Each structure stands twice: as structure tokens, then as C-alpha cells.
Amino acid sequence: NVEEFINRFKDRANAVKDRPMPPIGGDERMQFMKQAELDYQDYMIISDSEFEVTDEYLIFKYKLDN
């Protein structure tokens, strides 16, 4: 079910956004924060996309000026 798939990505995006910072500092902290931002962005792109099934392919469409 594609709707459930999309909802799981929304849940993942929210989980990344709300995930607590582990007790790390310096470069590791910056790397963790950067990865969290990328994870959130990736999950939101999928969850905000329109989709269609064409010739047995699941196709996501994301408007770039979102």
C-alpha cells in the first residue's frame, strides 16, 4: 500500500526531527547534526511527493520549488 509507505516516511521524518542528541561533542556532534538534517530532508521529499504506478513502476514526483 503506497499510502502506508508514504505515512511511514512522514513518521520517520518526524522521528529524525525529534530524535535526541547523543552525548557527543566536537566533530562527531556536527556530523550527527548534518546527518539528521539530511535524513529529515530525504524522508520529507518522499512523504511530500505525488506518486503514480506506471508499467509496474512506482514513480514519485516532487516539485522542486517546494
Protein language model features and the residues they cover:
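Compositionally biased, non-globular sequence tracts
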Residues: N1-N66
